[in-house]
Amino acid sequence: IYAITRSADTNWWKAVTQSAPIQSHNINASGATEKARYSFSLGYFSADYITKFTSYDRISLRANTEFKGLNDKLTIGENFTASFDNQKGQFTNDEEQNAVSAGYKHHPLLPIYDIAGNFAGSRGANLGNNFNPYASLKRNEDDRVFRLRLLGNVFANYEITPELSVRSSFGVDVRG
């Protein structure tokens, strides 16, 4: 009984949450001449989530160019974006069965660890029948989801008259 009562008053919310700093950096370059316009950007975004052991990082690249020819009647160009995402940790939203929900519902009498040093459980009557939210986050801290996305199009526009033009474009959206 001492082993249980000495760990009373577990602050589950504090056990599963953390400060969540965010940082975002971008570098842009753009310019134009009479016959061309261009814009390039490189970005980095990083965020720790409010739940421990979870984070998100993204690197993105964007390029837009446009060129004029044939007495300024023809315009060709492209728009291209590439991004690489890295998610670390547990990213689920299972209604009420997630670490955030359990963090405020879990009984404070239950410890994070049992007397053997293993994660303590709580499946039982009158204890909320919830899982150990800290254990769930900790066990998934090395889970990773990597995603690459390529999105772009090329186009050509020809001005037949000032009131009439023809445009053709081809685009792609690749996710992997």
Show where each model-derived region lies.
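Surface-exposed loop/interface segments of Gram-negative outer-membrane beta-barrel transport/assembly proteins
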Residues: 1-8, 49-54, 60-151, 167-176
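Short strand-turn segments of transmembrane beta-barrel domains in outer membranes
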Residues: 2-28, 41-51
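Aromatic-residue hotspot detector
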Residues: 12, 56, 153-155
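Outer-membrane beta-barrel transmembrane strands
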Residues: 18-36, 43-45, 135-174
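Beta-strand residues in well-ordered beta-sheet regions across diverse protein folds
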Residues: 39-41, 77
